[in-house]
């Protein structure tokens, strides 16, 4: 059979005369002739007739009904052949839906526009009720002379909602007197079937174009337009947020608006009564480090009481909280100003190498420590005296040269001093004289060395009870009324 069909197109199917032949006479006659010419002789005549009749009916159905419509809707052909049950499941009727409003970018909720609202929530899903209520609203709605009248995507909200119903301008037809005025170049096409009563909280209005002027329709004005006004009968509104924002947006609290307190009463922007927005004031305070010293970061905007505005801010005198730097007390005696304590003492205690430089800088100390004249070498002529003075400076009466020499070895590792080999009690600084003086005496301030101990301490680092005299008898403490005198041998008070 294949060798007979070389002159024809691929997969030519012979056909017999079909039941539905009107409108396709030439085609059926051609197929009938082809069938008679190329029919296989091995098939029984009756079976081939039935088979070709079924194929002819399917071919006719495909040719007549499987046409791509002009719209973008996907079309599924509906097979109503009487013999199609033998090849397919029982016949199913497919309902042809009207064109979805989601295909129109100007009417789709999912089409994001680049305009912002002061408040509200963004809607990302198209309405599932527009197709179901299109027929009802188209039959019951008033025929408008301007079907492209722009509807405000913002809900007309009032702080005091009407009992039972809520009128919203996004789903209202304005009166006929204002329809001709509302038709302008910025309007987007809106099918009258999309203006319908909504009874669900999932409904969201479509967004308008960027250049469209947002119109606020007065509820009293819109409700007087006859049968064109519709109501939403649910208590959970869907406020449109700006499409370009994907973060949480909170309302501005009028307590934070300083202009409202300064310039007098102004319209306050409170959130609507049906929306609960959690507001927490910014904490401008913290626990002060110094007890009794208030924080310098107290901010008036953190309080709701308007009387704080008269007190002003506490940014003027902040040195009482944290001083810029710790400096020695400045005293003035005899017309001369000096600081109590050297600058390096402000950064910590006096170090040993600084103490030695201070001793070498004073010529009156040449009898126990002096320069040798060979660079930065110096000799401890009386090392015990130097150790004693160092003990006075550090309030360590038990200081001796052995302890002092162990402290000097620390400077060997740090590269500050070195021990001169072959000579006893001779050391040298490894830096330049100018650098040594600069580091030892910052701001050219010589330290004031201590001449005596702050208090008398014996060699055993104990403080004797020198204020108590053994020879003086002290009166005993007055005994309690229920106790006798204490049998202490001496008059010490314990």
Swiss-Prot record:
Provide a Gene Ontology MF annotation, just one. Answer: DNA-binding transcription factor activity, RNA polymerase II-specific
Keywords, alphabetical: Activator, DNA-binding, Nucleus, Phosphoprotein, Transcription, Transcription regulation
Instruction: Summarize tissue expression.
Output: In the embryo, expressed ubiquitously until the late blastula stage, in the marginal zone of gastrula stages, in the presumptive forebrain and hindbrain and in the trunk region of early somite stages. In later stages, also expressed in Rohon-Beard neurons, epiphysis, lateral line placodes, pectoral fin buds, developing lens and heart.
* Gene Ontology BP terms: cell differentiation; embryo development ending in birth or egg hatching; limb morphogenesis; positive regulation of DNA-templated transcription; pronephric nephron tubule epithelial cell differentiation; pronephros development; regulation of DNA-templated transcription; regulation of transcription by RNA polymerase II
Modification after translation: Phosphorylated.
Q: Where is the composition biased (Low complexity)?
A: 176-187
The biased composition feature labelled Polar residues covers 100-113, 188-197
Q: Which residues bind DNA?
A: 350-430
Write out the ranges of the annotated region (Disordered). Answer: 82-113, 139-201
Q: Which domain of life is it from?
A: Eukaryota
One matching Pfam family is ETS_PEA3_N
**What induces its synthesis?**
By the fibroblast growth factors FGF3 and FGF8.
Q: Where, if anywhere, are coiled coils annotated?
A: none
Q: What is one GO cellular-component annotation here?
A: nucleus
- Localisation per UniProt entry: Nucleus
Q: Which PROSITE patterns match?
A: ETS_DOMAIN_1, ETS_DOMAIN_2, ETS_DOMAIN_3
Give the similarity note.
Belongs to the ETS family.
Question: Any other noteworthy remark?
Answer: Transcriptional activation activity is enhanced by Raf1, ERK and PKA.
- Which function does this protein serve? Transcriptional activator that binds to the (5'-CCGGA[AT]-3') motif. May control the acquisition of specific cell fates at an early stage during development of the somites and nervous system. May mediate the cellular effects of the fibroblast growth factors on embryogenesis.
Q: What is this protein called?
A: ETS translocation variant 4
Species source reads Danio rerio (Zebrafish)
């Amino acid at each position: 059979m294949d060798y007979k069909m070389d002159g024809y197109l691929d997969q030519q199917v012979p056909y017999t005369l079909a039941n539905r032949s009107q409108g396709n006479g030439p085609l059926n006659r051609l197929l009938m002739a082809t069938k008679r010419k190329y029919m296989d002789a091995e098939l029984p005549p009756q079976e081939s007739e039935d088979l070709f009749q079924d194929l002819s009916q399917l071919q006719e159905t495909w040719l007549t009904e499987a046409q791509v419509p002009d719209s973008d809707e996907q079309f599924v052909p509906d097979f109503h052949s009487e013999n199609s049950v033998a090849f397919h499941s029982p016949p199913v009727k497919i309902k042809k839906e009207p064109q979805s409003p989601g295909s129109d970018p100007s009417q789709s909720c999912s089409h994001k526009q680049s305009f912002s609202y002061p408040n509200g929530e963004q809607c990302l899903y198209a309405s599932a009720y527009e197709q179901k209520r299109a027929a009802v609203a188209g039959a019951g709605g008033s025929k408008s002379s301007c079907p492209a009248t722009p509807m405000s995507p913002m809900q007309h909200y009032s702080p005091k909602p009407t009992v039972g119903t809520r009128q919203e301008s996004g789903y209202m037809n304005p009166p006929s007197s204002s329809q001709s005025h509302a038709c302008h170049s910025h309007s987007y096409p809106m099918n009258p079937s999309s203006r319908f009563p909504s009874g669900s909280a999932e409904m969201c209005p479509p967004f308008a174009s960027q250049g469209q002027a947002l119109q606020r329709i007065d509820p009293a004005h819109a409700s007087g337009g006859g049968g064109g006004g519709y109501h939403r009968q649910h208590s959970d509104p869907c406020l449109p947020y700006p499409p370009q924002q994907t973060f949480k947006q909170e309302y501005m609290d009028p307590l934070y608006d300083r202009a409202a307190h300064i310039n007098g009463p102004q319209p306050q922007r409170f959130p609507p009564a049906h929306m609960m927005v959690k507001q927490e004031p910014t904490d401008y305070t913290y626990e002060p480090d110094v007890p009794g010293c208030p924080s310098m970061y107290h901010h008036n905007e953190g309080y709701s009481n308007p009387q704080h505005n008269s007190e002003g801010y506490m940014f003027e005198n902040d040195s009482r909280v944290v001083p810029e730097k710790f400096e020695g007390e400045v005293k003035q005696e005899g017309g001369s100003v000096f600081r109590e304590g050297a600058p390096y003492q402000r950064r910590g205690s006096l170090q040993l190498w600084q103490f030695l430089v201070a001793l070498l800088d004073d010529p009156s100390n040449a009898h126990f420590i002096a320069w040798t004249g060979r660079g930065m070498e110096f000799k401890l002529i009386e090392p015990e005296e130097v150790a004693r003075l160092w003990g006075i400076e550090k309030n360590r009466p038990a200081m001796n040269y052995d302890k002092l020499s162990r402290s000097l070895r620390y400077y060997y590792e740090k590269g500050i001093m070195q021990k001169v080999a072959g000579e006893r009690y001779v050391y040298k600084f490894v830096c330049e004289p100018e650098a040594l003086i600069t580091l030892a005496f910052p701001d050219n301030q010589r330290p004031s060395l201590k001449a005596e101990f702050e208090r008398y301490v014996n060699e055993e680092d104990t403080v004797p009870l020198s204020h108590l005299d053994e020879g003086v008898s002290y009166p005993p403490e007055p005994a309690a009324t229920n106790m006798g005198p204490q049998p202490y041998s001496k008059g010490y008070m314990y």
